[in-house]
């Protein structure tokens, strides 16, 4: 009977160890849970960026205003008949 109780105690101890510290145990669960939260935050940021890109793509496909704005700001282009004026501030000496 003592041997049976000893075996059951050892089995219970082994099961508790694997539950708390073993593969797919509680410690792994909490680690994976924190990894999931971090990945969800990254995914949210990427979804927001993708939404902005889709909106810009739609704007470029449908209207000439966005194309004109990009040409003016990124390429420095002007419309025919426009004059470009640059105002330079004074440097402190």
UniProtKB/Swiss-Prot annotation:
Quaternary organization: Part of a complex composed of FtsB, FtsL and FtsQ.
Which GO annotations describe the biological process of this protein?
FtsZ-dependent cytokinesis
Gene Ontology terms: cellular component: cell division site; cell septum; plasma membrane
Protein's name according to its UniProt entry? Cell division protein FtsB
Q: Which PANTHER family match?
A: CELL DIVISION PROTEIN FTSB
**Subcellular location per the Swiss-Prot or TrEMBL entry:** Cell inner membrane
Asked if the Swiss-Prot or TrEMBL record annotates the protein with the keyword Cell inner membrane, the reply is: yes
Give the classification, highest ranks: Bacteria, Pseudomonadati, Pseudomonadota, Gammaproteobacteria, Vibrionales
Q: Which organism does this record belong to?
A: Vibrio vulnificus (strain YJ016)
Instruction: State the family named in the UniProt similarity comment for this chain.
Output: Belongs to the FtsB family.
Cytoplasmic face residues: 1-3
Q: Which UniProt keywords apply?
A: Cell cycle, Cell division, Cell inner membrane, Cell membrane, Coiled coil, Membrane, Transmembrane, Transmembrane helix
Q: How is this protein situated with respect to the membrane?
A: Single-pass type II membrane protein
- What positions belong to coiled-coil segments? 42-75
Q: Which residues lie on this side of the membrane: Periplasmic?
A: 22-93
Q: Which InterPro entries match?
A: Cell_div_FtsB (IPR023081), FtsL/DivIC (IPR007060)
User: Major place of localization?
Assistant: membrane
Query: What NCBIfam families does UniProt report for this protein, alphabetically?
Result: PRK00888.1 (NF002058)
- Keyword Cell cycle attached: yes
Q: Which residues cross the membrane?
A: 4-21
| Entry function | Essential cell division protein. May link together the upstream cell division proteins, which are predominantly cytoplasmic, with the downstream cell division proteins, which are predominantly periplasmic.
């Amino acid at each position: 009977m003592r041997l049976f109780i000893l075996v059951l105690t050892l089995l219970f101890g082994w099961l508790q160890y694997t539950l708390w510290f073993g593969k797919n145990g509680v410690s792994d669960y909490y680690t994976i849970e924190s990894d999931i939260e971090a990945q969800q935050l990254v995914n949210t940021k990427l979804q927001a960026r993708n939404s902005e890109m889709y909106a810009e793509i739609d704007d470029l496909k449908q209207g000439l205003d966005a194309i004109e704005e990009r040409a003016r700001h990124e390429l420095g282009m002007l419309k025919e008949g426009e004059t470009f004026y640059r105002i330079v501030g004074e440097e402190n000496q």
